[in-house]
């Protein structure tokens, strides 16, 4: 039974994350030189995983199914390393080196900074509410 609950949590989370990424692409990608939908998905995912990391550390007794639903499922469906990689390789293949490497930098450093910001935000809010 526990296995089925875990599978269901991952499936629901992944479906919702993928739908959110799809909507971001529809909203932000049409005609954009830089695929902003993919960037937004990865940056939002970076921030949200930071929040999740801090919350799960602060609440160690929280049912692990939440980690599966939120991190493995939702954030796994929302963020996309493969699309980011294909977009950057496409830019480099078109000899748009500045755009390609700039995009790679935005994804990498932006996600790292927003993950740290998410951890700091959640840590502050947890400390503020205790």
Curated annotation (Swiss-Prot):
Na(+) is not transported, but it plays an essential structural role and its presence is essential for fluoride channel function. It is found in: Cell inner membrane. InterPro entries: FluC. It comes from the Bacteria. Belongs to the fluoride channel Fluc/FEX (TC 1.A.43) family. HAMAP family: FluC. This is Fluoride-specific ion channel FluC. The lineage of its organism: Bacteria, Pseudomonadati, Pseudomonadota, Betaproteobacteria, Burkholderiales.
């Amino acid at each position: 039974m526990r296995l089925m609950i875990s599978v269901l949590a991952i499936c629901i989370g992944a479906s919702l994350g993928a739908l959110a990424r799809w909507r971001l692409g529809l909203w932000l990608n049409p005609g954009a030189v830089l695929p902003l939908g993919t960037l937004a998905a990865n940056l939002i995912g970076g921030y949200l995983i930071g929040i999740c990391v801090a919350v799960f550390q602060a609440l160690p007794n929280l049912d692990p199914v939440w980690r599966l639903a939120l991190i493995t499922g939702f954030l796994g469906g929302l963020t996309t390393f493969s699309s980011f990689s294909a977009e950057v390789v496409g830019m480099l293949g078109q000899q748009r080196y500045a755009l390609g490497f700039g995009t790679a930098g935005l994804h990498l450093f932006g996600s790292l900074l927003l993950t740290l910001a998410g951890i700091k935000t959640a840590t502050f809010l947890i400390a503020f509410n205790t």
